[in-house]
Amino acid sequence: MIACLSLNPCWDKTMTVPQFFLDAPNRVQTLRADVGGKGVNVARAAAALGAECCLVGQDYQGAPVAAAMAREGVACYLRPAPGEMRVNLKIQDQAAGRTLEINESGPLADGELLPAMKALLLAHCPAGGWAALSGSLPQGLPPESYALLTAALKAAGVHVAVDCDGAALERAVEAGPDVIKPNAQEFQRLTGVNPLDRAAALAACRALHGRGVGLICLSLGAAGALLSLPEAAYSCQAPRVPVRGLQGAGDSMLAGLLTALARGLEPAQALAFASAAAGASVQREGTLLCRRADVEKLLPGLRVEKIRL
């Protein structure tokens, strides 16, 4: 079982315009709206890859989170929340080949949110299962929120993966999560190290292992990915695919990694599966995520190399 936490779900709205102009009307060419947020995306991608998973989180008034997830075979355990679900807007400028992102913060969390999420996670993620704690924290929650949940879950025998940024990630590291999955920018903010400097990045990973982090999956976009364990490290090139949408690639990578680990795959195999999932995601437009058939097509073309430490 992979239980995916979604503290701050959203509407993911993606618009395309022929050319984006400031101080002038912009006519929308296409519009797509999906229920999203990192936790939702990880659950959707994991389900698409065949994993047994569920979504734990908040359900805002008028937000069809449960209905959307049910269509994809994901069980939901949601706590009713006041307010409206936030909107993440992406405007794709076709002429420039660039995307403008505008993300709302979302409603203020109440004091009962964290205890409620802890209880739901412990109730629906058995010992030996995985919990994925990902995404931004709602306003009102302290930065140590993921650290507190990590400690409680690990004490119950649950494996924990954390995918977040900034102070929340810094605090979570202190609780010794089994997996973290930073991208290049998040890794640099966490460690102060350029992730493209492999020797320095691996040294920073070893320091994180020394603080209790089990496995580090460092996603580097077109430069591929690194997987670091206390005793070994691996690299994998990025799949060669047409890039149609970057949104959700990291969530697909985490879903692929956890699906592989839950199936008992070795680390090198898990990295290949995660990289294929990310590649399968970027070749789809907007907020569409990976598909199992695409992952299986990409896997044979990926080569994982063990890095000499």
Q: Which role fits each region the language model picked out?
A:
Residues 1-23:
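Positively charged, low-complexity intrinsically disordered leader regions
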Residues 5-7, 57, 77-78, 132-133, ...:
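General beta-strand structural signal in soluble alpha/beta enzymes
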Residues 27-85, 298-301:
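Substrate-binding N-lobe of the ribokinase-like
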Residues 44, 89-91, 224-228:
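Short beta-strand scaffold segments in enzyme catalytic cores
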Residues 47, 154, 262:
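Gly/Ala-rich phosphate-binding loop of Rossmann-like dinucleotide-binding domains
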Residues 143-231:
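Conserved phosphate/ATP/ADP-binding segment of small-molecule kinases
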